[in-house]
């Protein structure tokens, strides 16, 4: 054992032992309780960031603690390796996405290994490899057979210059991110999955999940189950009688309709725009906008009157039809009723274009004005219908029932349950993804690839150039034979949404070498006992993975219908930001490591200068670490300088896992100092700690009893904190332990050995390298086996017993001191001790005790 703690040497030695022992390979064992903990697999972007370090350390701590408690634990890892960033990098560097991806995986895997993570690498999954995505294709075909997958036209963003489809995030202010061309909306055939078929189950099953309430609420709102009325506004056009259908959750406001708005893609819009260039120009403008719902929510609401009217379904009055840029064809019926008096968006639209505003809901005693928006119908319990003819005076529920009944009687509508959730469009007009296993035959149409011909292998040697899909230009991939008729045919060139890849990888971890999609091992490990990832995945990834599990269950592949029992969404890692702004308003961001900050006498930052030129920079505040703000910390530099254990200790100590973590260089230094203290104590006391001698706890000297009482008391709290995932207080407990052990005077070697051994085991899940090496160097491994498999220390309840207890002493309700009494002291003895105490005499000032209040085990209050 070396006197000096050298993290690089310690960590290399520990990792060498773990590799030699194949320490983290997990096997199924029906006789042991399993614990399957998974961190959301990373995208291989090139390097780990501190968010990764925090996530994986949380997972690792959980794994090690539960393994010490006898669980059969598994912590796997893989790579979410398909996706657009690889294509962008390929275009920038002139290399195939495959090369860029595999190089990044190799580097990031090396980084993970340097962290000492308890990963079973024999289960590694890489989603861009054919042995994985074969099963994406296989399940897609099964879903196609069952009608869970289907084909229809869908709207996409089309860049007319680059001749390619753009993701929503690639459309910036209505233009393509590379070409700058005005983006168009296009309707193209795409494949969808019927997630809506599972909407109620996805909603109801949320109640049984141990997930953060925030995530459950987000999914609940995304699914968006609504109870309302679907009805139509009658109209006649080209000699045909039709209905302009809408859905509303507020049928009680129908009498307040003053206009209808339809989407630019609505069939009625195209018909009304014939021979109307201005109307067609507005439709074209709408189609150039993004197709994301978020874009619609934030964009300026604009519309154009069509000059056409439909009839109000209850009054027969004409209702003007507008085309609105805020109406989505993909939601509802592609048309909405405009009730400006009782809908804020409609109110703004009506004020902008001078449309009538008709109040039809009121609360008695309240005054209404059309000058500014008011929540006129927010109070459903007190509001009643007004200006609504025979419905006047009806409350919300009664009005909805009556109006729905009249619409139904007239054949115009009825009550309906709808969902905000839409079917999952999985087609992507991109190269770097799972090929959709469909062949297009001139004679047979769309033909599924036969199961025996799977996987349809994606060529890995193509380099995208930004002009269309490389697969469409690859004869070797594109040209094939129809499996039905044998004629020349073409492969589908769309690939699958990368959310397909991440929808089930955790099931493949359980059986990575299976010759089927999954096998019996999957039902042993799944569902995950703990899933860990960022809140940003609350909706899409987590919702799709829940859907995928239910589909796999219904196909008889697995026994479970939910992929994760428990979910932890770790907080973001934050750091200071610094910038300079030029005359044009452009900001240049500087890394905190390149800046010197000055503070006032209260420790608040008051200024900063750039180290390289000594000139001031602006303080931008604390924000999430990101490339855009240049405020990240390179984990590899941290590990190289301080060691992985210091990085792990800081990230666990700085904040509870679910809360945001503010980066602190001083905190990292503090973590490093603490580990040096742990090592230094072990080295300085190595001879005493090597003493293996039994002891009779009851016969120990008071100093030994005091030390054991403190250590076992802190151990009890640390055990509780590990179970509730409060790792920051676990580290605090370990620090208390070290303080107690260092401060113990006259302790016998055997007691010192016991208590230091408890400290090493409490710290081990957080800092496995240094504790593993100390455990071995000080002979604990010879006695108990390697720390990898050492059992969690048991609390000695007898050690917590005290002959004396300390009570708070109060005089007239104010704390005046402390009173030590025998643990089993009678009330009379406590009262006598209180009035005899010197602090009572001092503050009573000669006055006798009138009343003595004793709260057992806590305090004694003497009233004078």
Curated annotation (Swiss-Prot):
EC number assigned by the record: 6.1.1.4
Chief localisation class: cytoplasm
GO cellular component terms attached to this protein's record: cytosol
Subcellular location: Cytoplasm
Sites where the protein binds ATP: 627
Catalytic activity: tRNA(Leu) + L-leucine + ATP = L-leucyl-tRNA(Leu) + AMP + diphosphate
Pfam families: Anticodon_1, tRNA-synt_1, tRNA-synt_1_2, tRNA-synt_1g
InterPro entries (UniProt xref): aa-tRNA-synth_I_CS, aa-tRNA-synth_Ia, Leu-tRNA-ligase, Leu_tRNA-synth_edit, M/V/L/I-tRNA-synth_anticd-bd, Methionyl/Leucyl_tRNA_Synth, Rossmann-like_a/b/a_fold, tRNAsynth_Ia_anticodon-bd
Keywords: Aminoacyl-tRNA synthetase, ATP-binding, Cytoplasm, Ligase, Nucleotide-binding, Protein biosynthesis
Single GO term (MF): ATP binding
GO biological process: leucyl-tRNA aminoacylation
Span of the annotated motif 'HIGH' region: 42-52
Placement of sequence motif 'KMSKS' region: 624-628
Family: Belongs to the class-I aminoacyl-tRNA synthetase family.
PANTHER family named in the record: LEUCINE--TRNA LIGASE, MITOCHONDRIAL (PTHR43740:SF2), LEUCYL-TRNA SYNTHETASE (PTHR43740)
Protein name (database record): Leucine--tRNA ligase
Organism of this sequence: Burkholderia pseudomallei (strain 1710b)
């Amino acid at each position: 054992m070396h006197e000096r703690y050298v993290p690089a040497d310690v960590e290399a030695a520990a990792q060498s032992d773990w590799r030699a022992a194949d320490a983290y390979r997990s096997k199924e064992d029906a006789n042991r309780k399993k614990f399957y903990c998974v961190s959301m697999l990373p995208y291989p972007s090139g390097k780990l960031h501190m968010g990764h370090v925090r996530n994986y350390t949380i997972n690792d701590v959980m794994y090690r603690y539960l393994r010490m408690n006898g669980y059969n634990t598994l912590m796997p890892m893989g790579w979410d390796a398909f996706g657009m960033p690889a294509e962008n990098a390929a275009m920038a560097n002139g290399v195939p996405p495959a090369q860029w991806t595999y190089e990044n995986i190799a580097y990031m895997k090396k980084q993970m290994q340097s962290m000492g993570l308890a990963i079973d690498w024999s289960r590694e999954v890489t989603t861009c490899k054919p042995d994985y995505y074969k099963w994406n294709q296989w399940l897609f075909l099964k879903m196609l057979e069952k009608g869970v997958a289907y084909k229809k036209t869908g709207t996409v963003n089309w860049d007319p210059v680059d001749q390619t489809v753009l993701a929503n995030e690639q459309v910036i202010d209505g233009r393509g991110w590379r070409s700058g061309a005005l983006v168009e909306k296009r309707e193209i055939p795409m494949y969808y999955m019927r997630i809506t078929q599972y909407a109620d189950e996805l909603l109801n099953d949320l109640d049984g999940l141990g997930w953060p309430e925030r995530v459950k609420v987000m999914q609940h709102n995304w699914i968006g189950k609504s109870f309302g009325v679907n009805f139509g506004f009658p109209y006649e056009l080209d000699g045909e009688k039709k209905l302009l259908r809408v859905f509303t959750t507020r049928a009680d406001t129908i009498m307040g309709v003053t206009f209808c708005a339809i989407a630019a893609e609505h069939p009625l819009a195209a018909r009304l725009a014939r021979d109307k260039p201005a109307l067609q120009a507005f439709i074209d403008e709408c189609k150039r906008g993004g197709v994301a719902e978020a874009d619609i929510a934030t964009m300026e609401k604009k519309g154009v009157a069509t000059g056409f009217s439909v009839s109000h379904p209850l009054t027969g009055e004409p209702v003007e039809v507008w085309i609105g840029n805020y109406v989505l064809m993909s939601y509802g019926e592609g048309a909405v009723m405009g009730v400006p008096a009782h809908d804020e968006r409609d109110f703004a639209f009506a004020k902008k274009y001078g449309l009538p505003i008709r109040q039809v809901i009121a609360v008695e005693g309240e005054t209404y004005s059309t000058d500014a928006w008011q929540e006129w119908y927010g109070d459903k319990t007190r509001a009643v219908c007004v200006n609504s003819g025979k419905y006047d005076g009806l409350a919300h529920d009664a009005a909805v029932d009556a109006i729905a009944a009249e619409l139904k009687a007239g054949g115009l509508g009825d009550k309906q349950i709808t969902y905000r959730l839409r079917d999952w469009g999985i087609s992507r007009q991109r190269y770097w993804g799972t090929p959709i296993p469909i062949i297009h035959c001139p004679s047979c149409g769309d033909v599924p690839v036969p199961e025996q011909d799977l996987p349809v292998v994606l060529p890995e040697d193509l380099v995208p150039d930004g002009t269309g899909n490389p697969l469409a230009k690859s004869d070797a991939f594109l040209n094939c034979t129809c499996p039905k008729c044998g004629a020349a045919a073409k492969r589908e060139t769309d690939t699958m949404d990368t959310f397909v890849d991440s929808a089930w990888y955790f099931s493949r971890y359980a059986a990575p070498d299976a010759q089927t999609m999954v096998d019996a091992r999957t039902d042993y490990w799944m569902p995950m006992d703990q899933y860990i990832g960022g809140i940003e995945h609350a909706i899409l990834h987590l919702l799709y993975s829940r859907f995928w599990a239910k589909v796999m269950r219904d196909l008889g592949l697995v026994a479970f219908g939910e992929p994760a029992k428990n979910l932890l969404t770790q907080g973001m890692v934050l750091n200071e930001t610094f910038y300079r702004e030029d005359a044009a308003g452009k900001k240049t961001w500087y890394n905190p490591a390149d800046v010197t900050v000055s503070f006032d006498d209260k420790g608040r930052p008051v200024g900063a200068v750039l180290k390289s030129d000594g000139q001031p920079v602006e303080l931008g505040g604390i924000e999430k670490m990101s490339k855009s703000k240049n405020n990240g910390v390179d984990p590899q530099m941290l590990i190289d300088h301080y060691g992985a254990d210091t990085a792990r200790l800081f990230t666990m100590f700085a904040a509870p896992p679910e809360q945001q973590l503010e980066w602190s260089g001083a905190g990292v230094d503090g973590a490093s100092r603490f580990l040096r203290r742990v090592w230094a104590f072990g080295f300085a006391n190595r001879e005493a700690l090597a003493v293996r001698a039994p002891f009779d706890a009851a016969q120990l000297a008071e100093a030994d009893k005091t030390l054991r009482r403190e250590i076992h008391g802190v151990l009890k709290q640390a055990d509780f904190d590990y179970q509730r995932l409060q790792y920051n207080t676990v580290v605090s407990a370990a620090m208390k332990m070290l303080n107690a052990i260092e401060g113990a005077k006259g302790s016998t070697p055997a007691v010192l050995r016991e208590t230091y051994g408890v400290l090493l085991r409490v710290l081990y899940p957080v800092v496995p390298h240094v504790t593993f090496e100390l455990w071995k160097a000080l002979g604990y491994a010879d006695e108990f086996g390697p720390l990898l498999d050492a059992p969690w220390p048991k609390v000695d309840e007898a050690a917590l017993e005290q002959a004396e207890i300390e009570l708070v002493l109060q005089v007239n309700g104010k704390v005046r001191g402390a009173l030590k009494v025998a643990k089993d002291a009678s009330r009379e003895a406590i009262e006598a001790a209180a009035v005899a105490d010197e602090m009572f005499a001092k503050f009573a000032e000669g006055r006798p005790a009138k009343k003595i209040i004793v709260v057992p085990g806590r305090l004694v209050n003497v009233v004078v």
